[in-house]
Design a protein with these regions (language model features):
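Mature N-terminal segment immediately following signal peptide/propeptide cleavage
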Residues: 3-29
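Stable alpha-helical elements in mature extracytoplasmic
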Residues: 8-13, 20, 37, 41, ...
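Sec/Tat-exported extracytoplasmic proteins
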Residues: 20-28, 41, 45-52, 62-69, ...
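Extended, small/polar residue-biased N-terminal targeting/export presequences
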Residues: 28-94, 143, 151-196, 393-409
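PDZ/PDZ-like domain segments forming the peptide/carboxylate-binding groove
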Residues: 77-129, 213
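Conserved PDZ fold ligand-binding element
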Residues: 105-129, 232-234, 304-307, 312-314, ...
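Cleft-lining beta-strand/loop regions that shape enzyme active-site pockets
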Residues: 141-334
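Low-complexity, Gly/Ser/Thr/Pro-rich intrinsically disordered linker/tail segments
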Residues: 364-405
């Protein structure tokens, strides 16, 4: 690693120390000697041989807090790596769930394959968050070695190459092309995360992929829902979003003010209240969750349980429920390197006195898809919810309602 690179990462490590000391919700930092750890990781940084190892030192420093919402976002990479596959937890087991047509992954993997190991890492619920962070943000891989079990239980190994898409390491915001790319880099992600509602008989099935809607968007959605007797709110795969969006969602489901919980920040504790307004949906409510339902999804599911408002069905949730802010950093003048830190600035304690971080929400009815369901494209969980809603929807048809949308490369 060059001297300039060493200095760049040393600045990042120092900023990580300072942002946490300034903004982290727990002034005691869980009893950690943060400055002593900084000195320790500064020593580790001197041994880093390249940028990747340097980034891992910064990430490991923040991981000492063992907090799902506090982490390092490395600089914009000169290459984008598309794996061509998606994987997800079902219970304590990881499965391949999606394959990009035409990718190397599609020629070697099968939907429904159980992922035993990825490039030497054993994949399970306990380490799943760290594995996702490593492969997707911290150290994207140009190839992945898999140890797999087919839906029939047959073991095999596969070596899957990722697709490399080149882009600039440094964006020059005085360059019109670079500026356009910077301003539009999130548009395709937003399109893929859009909310969708399907009406079948007396039920509305609302696929809410993120809590990213404003009050007007939520009001329009509830305008559709109000026409039906049952709402199936599908929060599977929903990682969370903004607390304001959660408040508006809760307000649309209850005829009274609802305390989401207490926001315990560094200096004070304040109640978070969803104020009811207008005409709430008063019909039957079924909420679907899975292991990828995080943050606001978990809060909403637990509120439904605490308030006895409906039934929660599916898998135990992600257990990643804190409130954080992202602090962006740059190095360089006109030609900038962008990176930053997510820092938890509040703990959310629910009205029953419990914190969902590291515990999650256990559904009222535990119901998981099988490997065979995944392989065949069946959604047995949604089909069961439809049955409870009094509508006919077989697992095959349920699996086709909300097809996965790959972003263009």
């Amino acid at each position: 690693m060059s001297k300039d690179q060493q200095e760049m990462i040393a600045v990042m490590l120092r900023e990580a120390r300072d942002e946490v000391k300034k903004h982290y919700y727990d002034a005691t930092l869980h009893g950690l000697d943060w400055d002593a750890l900084y000195k320790q990781y500064t020593g580790s940084l001197a041994k880093a041989r390249n940028l990747g190892e340097g980034y891992r030192v910064v990430a490991a420093y923040l991981e000492e807090l063992k907090d799902s919402h506090t982490y390092f976002m490395p600089p914009w990479s000169p290459i984008h790596l598309d794996y061509g596959f998606r994987y997800a937890l079902v219970g304590d087991t990881c499965y391949i769930t999606q394959l990009r047509p035409g990718s190397d992954a599609a020629s070697k993997l099968q939907i429904g394959d159980q992922v035993v190991k990825m490039s030497g890492f054993t994949v399970n619920r306990g380490d799943f968050h760290d594995i996702q962070y490593y492969f997707n943000l911290l150290a994207p891989q140009t190839a992945v070695r898999f140890e797999l079990l087919s839906p029939a239980g047959e073991a095999r190994q596969e070596f899957v190459n990722t697709r490399v898409v080149s882009r600039k390491l440094i964006l020059d915001l005085n360059n019109g092309v670079d500026l356009w790319e910077f301003e539009h880099m999130g548009e395709e992600e937003a399109l893929a995360a859009r909310s969708r509602i399907v009406e079948i008989g007396d039920a509305a099935i609302w696929k809410l992929k993120e809590f990213n809607l404003d009050s007007d968007q939520i009001d329009r959605a509830f305008g559709i829902v109000h026409k039906r007797k049952t709402l199936i709110l599908d929060l599977r795969g929903n990682p969370g979003g903004t607390i304001e969006s959660l408040k508006w969602m809760v307000a649309g489901l209850f005829d009274h003010d609802v305390k989401i919980g207490d926001r315990a920040g560094k200096k004070e504790k304040k109640p978070v209240i969803a104020k009811h307004s207008g005409r709430p949906f008063e019909g039957k409510l079924i909420v679907l969750v899975d292991a990828a339902s995080g943050s606001c999804s978990e809060l909403l599911a637990r509120i439904v349980q605490i308030e006895h408002r409906g039934t929660v069905i599916g898998d135990k949730t992600a257990a990643e429920v804190m409130e954080a802010k992202f602090y962006s950093e740059t190095q360089g003048a006109d030609a900038k390197i962008y990176y930053g830190f997510s820092v938890t600035d509040a703990n959310l304690i629910m009205s029953d006195g419990q914190n969902l971080e590291k515990t999650g929400v256990t559904p009222d009815e535990l119901l998981l898809p099988t490997a065979a369901d995944l392989a065949a494209g069946r959604d047995s969980v949604l089909a069961h919810a439809a049955e409870l809603a009094g509508i006919k929807l077989d697992p095959e048809a349920a699996g086709k309602l909300f097809p996965y949308e790959w972003q263009p490369l």
